A protein has these predicted regions:
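Midchain, well-structured core segments that form catalytic/ion-binding scaffolds
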Residues: 1-176
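Active-site-adjacent substrate-binding region
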Residues: 29-30, 36, 41-43, 51-64, ...
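General structural feature for long, well-ordered alpha-helical segments within catalytic domains
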Residues: 40, 44, 95-98, 153-156, ...
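Generic non-transmembrane alpha-helical segments
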Residues: 51-64, 98-109, 113, 187-196, ...
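A short small-residue
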Residues: 77-85, 168, 198-203, 264-271
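Short histidine-centered catalytic/ligand-binding loop motif
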Residues: 89-92, 113-118, 203-212, 273-276
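Substrate-recognition/cap regions that form aromatic- and gly/pro-loop-enriched pockets
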Residues: 161-239
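Zn-dependent metallopeptidase/amidohydrolase metal-coordination segment
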Residues: 163, 222-297
Length: 299
């Protein structure tokens, strides 16, 4: 469930759901994003109780937004982003964030003619969401952190919904060993208090690591380098594997980074997932020799 050479460290995981104050008679009828919290949404759909022709044309990200009229007289905003995994936001575009940006634009246009697009409760929560979606590293929320071993914290606001008179935004945070779930909660307090937002914490897992100097890690990395002719080093990642369920374990392949795939083939966990037969055969050889070497160690 990972890549070569050796992943000896996994970031901590923190999940929370932000909840708006009670919304009565709101304009935002529905709002959807990612299906799962660990997915960066490639599309987001928001239905507003207003005629489509009353909304201004988008300015920023116009090529990624579509505004259409629904049969019930409401407007639908459809955002096209670039999806990915929550732990690897590079090169992605969060579709929910595109709609947040548009709603802020539209509100400014309405304000300019002394009108209101959203109710006060919606307005405050959308302003809050602008901080949540400021970037993929938690800077807007004030929770950003980094460390040499683990790299930067990542924050994915992927799942969004309207439920029981409230708007809810879920975040998936992968954090380094320089911060903690308790610290993140403390850092969130000023912003949620400012906008009258409440939140509930879901998942919270501490970072996990095995030293790169561990004899077992050295045996694995040395074996990999011998077979590939590389000088690779162990790495940390934001994803999670079963390794963290053990006191002393790492993830070791079988995928290779930068492997050229056929046009019809997809990456691990993606549509049309495929593998290179020659690379799998090499991985088998690496595993056989690595296991024999581990067997010689006092673990």
């Amino acid at each position: 469930d990972a890549e070569f050479p050796v992943c000896n460290a996994e970031k901590g995981q923190f999940g929370a759901t932000f909840v708006s104050s009670r919304i009565d008679g709101g304009r935002i009828v529905s709002w959807s994003g990612a299906e799962a919290s660990n997915a960066i949404p490639s599309q987001s759909i928001c239905e507003l109780a207003i005629a489509a022709d009353e909304l201004p044309a988008p300015v920023e990200n116009a090529e990624r937004l579509e505004i259409t009229a629904l049969e019930n007289g409401h407007a639908q905003i459809f955002a096209h982003g670039i999806g990915g995994h929550a732990s690897m936001p590079e090169g992605t575009i969060n579709a929910v964030g595109l709609i947040v940006t548009y709603l802020r634009e539209a509100e400014d246009a309405f304000d300019a003619r002394d009108e209101r697009l959203l109710t006060p409760a919606e307005h405050e929560f959308v302003k809050f969401l602008a901080f949540v979606h400021a970037d993929a590293y938690g800077r807007g929320l004030g929770i950003d952190a980094t460390s040499p071993a683990f790299g930067p914290l990542t924050c994915n606001p992927g799942v969004i919904r309207v439920a029981d008179g409230h708007i809810e935004q879920v975040i998936d945070v992968r954090f380094p060993d320089s911060t903690s779930a308790d610290t993140i909660c403390e850092q969130l307090e000023p912003l949620v208090g400012r906008f009258g937002v409440t939140y509930r914490v879901g998942r919270a897992k501490v970072p996990f690591s095995v030293s790169a100097d561990d004899p077992a890690v050295k045996a694995l990395i040395d074996t990999y380098n011998e077979f590939t002719g590389k000088h690779a080093e162990p790495f940390a990642m934001g994803g999670g594997t079963y390794a963290r369920n053990f006191a002393r374990a790492v993830s070791f392949g079988p995928e290779e980074t930068g492997l050229e795939l056929p046009a019809w083939g997809g990456q691990m966990h993606g549509p049309n997932e495929c593998a290179n037969e020659e690379q799998l055969k090499q991985a088998l050889k690496i595993y056989i020799v690595a296991i024999l070497r581990l067997n010689e160690l006092e673990l």
